[in-house]
Swiss-Prot record:
<dbReference type="InterPro" id="IPR006641">
    <property type="entry name" value="YqgF/RNaseH-like_dom"/>
</dbReference>
<dbReference type="GO" id="GO:0005829">
    <property type="term" value="C:cytosol"/>
</dbReference>
<protein>
    <recommendedName>
        <fullName>Putative pre-16S rRNA nuclease</fullName>
        <ecNumber>3.1.-.-</ecNumber>
    </recommendedName>
</protein>
<keyword id="KW-0540">Nuclease</keyword>
<keyword id="KW-0963">Cytoplasm</keyword>
<comment type="function">
    <text>Could be a nuclease involved in processing of the 5'-end of pre-16S rRNA.</text>
</comment>
<comment type="similarity">
    <text>Belongs to the YqgF nuclease family.</text>
</comment>
<keyword id="KW-0378">Hydrolase</keyword>
<dbReference type="InterPro" id="IPR012337">
    <property type="entry name" value="RNaseH-like_sf"/>
</dbReference>
<keyword id="KW-0690">Ribosome biogenesis</keyword>
<dbReference type="Pfam" id="PF03652">
    <property type="entry name" value="RuvX"/>
</dbReference>
<dbReference type="InterPro" id="IPR005227">
    <property type="entry name" value="YqgF"/>
</dbReference>
<dbReference type="GO" id="GO:0004518">
    <property type="term" value="F:nuclease activity"/>
</dbReference>
<dbReference type="GO" id="GO:0000967">
    <property type="term" value="P:rRNA 5'-end processing"/>
</dbReference>
<dbReference type="InterPro" id="IPR037027">
    <property type="entry name" value="YqgF/RNaseH-like_dom_sf"/>
</dbReference>
Amino acid sequence: MRILGLDIGSKTIGVAVSDPLGWTAQGVTTIKRDCYTKDVEAVMKICKEYGVETIVAGMPKNMNGTIGPSGEMVKNLCEQIEKSFDGKIEFWDERLTTVAAHRAMLEADLSRAKRKKIVDKIAATYILQGYLDRISK
């Protein structure tokens, strides 16, 4: 059972996938956003490649727990994905995952250019790993 993690932003979508046992998350790629149709096609291609049964999308919430414009954008894209996807889609509170990803990359002494290229993929990995840790308990 593979699970896909998504960090959906306005310009890119970070993608991570679980190992077959659902224990660990690995970053896969960063999709450059285009339009809903092409975004969905790109996500579905990865789902088919890895045999994904569940998608976990990071839900950006405000610090007070409300959902703002970014959260609405995530919900809208997931509604489009749902039309093509046979599995289930779940949301995961992604507050501070990008901050954690930046911190980890700074500690690894990655250049600014390298950080910019992989931050969304790393954030997707954090989102998915958090979800995997929760369901394994």
